[in-house]
């Protein structure tokens, strides 16, 4: 595999929470191929068709652990047993509409779960880098026509978005209180950052209320694709885009622990911030057939219509920027869904990672 990190991850003990999820499975595959000793901590995958299941990554990594991040005691035990050096915290309740049904569980998972991971890091002798993954929806969304910068207020209308805003506030508090850069090497040895990405797409995602899985399920069933929010504008990006940013950030934090421990946006190119309807049209184009059906409901639960990220900071300070435009993102995503039935999915994922790194 192409290694843009110059053997940095080879032999590193890397703990990934949420490794059975969509982003977590792709991150675990990438890290494993780079020679990292991956410790996965998560609950069961969502479906038997998830990327985690079909790729078999759970059988390849150092440890594949079923545990709930709401169990702080268990988290500390896992950190003590496996001695991770780098932590990527992705485990979450990730759905806006579901958060209206289970608001308390959403907060318990996204806020207290995040705090439990930071507390496990605090008592660990091994952890040097913690990258906490939240979301672009953590910002107080005014539906403005320019992107949110990292220094803008946290907020959120619905329980999911606000729980991620609250998690960001907790991360900032723990950084100041327990992982303060001014005290690095004296009172602690942890560099802690948070990262915010846009609407991530890619192969192996079957979650509810997401445009790509909804499209693929309809296409495979020979039905029209129902579009709930055709005019909603989202910052679309392929899953490998933000993951490359998270991994680059962790490398830089390891090398310069007090310089990069803050919040970071990893969003798409400006031209990839497009309406849901346009993305669905691209899915149909690259899949080869299909029809769209506008089923928008004026009385539906509130979801933000416009949300954009400013990625200037990551560009200038990390040297990271998106490699693909929206059409390339959708094409690579659809490629996975067209091939997963009849191809080794782990090999397919490796092929897509290499293509992502080679072609852009």
Predicted regions and their residues:
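Residues in well-ordered alpha-helical elements
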Residues: 72-73, 85, 97, 104, ...
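A short C-terminal helix-loop "cap" of Rossmann-like NAD(P)-dependent dehydrogenase/epimerase domains
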Residues: 58-59, 151-153, 177-192, 215-227, ...
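Amphipathic alpha-helical segments in well-structured domains
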Residues: 114, 208-213, 246, 280
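Short aromatic-enriched loop/helix-cap "lid" or pocket-rim segments at secondary-structure transitions
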Residues: 50-53, 142-145, 205-209, 239-240, ...
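C-terminal substrate-binding subdomain of Rossmann-fold SDR/epimerase-dehydratase oxidoreductases
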Residues: 31-37, 67, 199, 219-360
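N-terminal Rossmann-like NAD(P)+-binding domain of SDR-like oxidoreductases, especially those catalyzing
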Residues: 1-197, 201, 340, 356-357
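Short, solvent-exposed loop/helix junctions and linker helices
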Residues: 17, 108-111, 160, 164, ...
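Generic structural signal for small/hydrophobic residues in well-ordered secondary structure
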Residues: 9, 19-21, 87, 117, ...
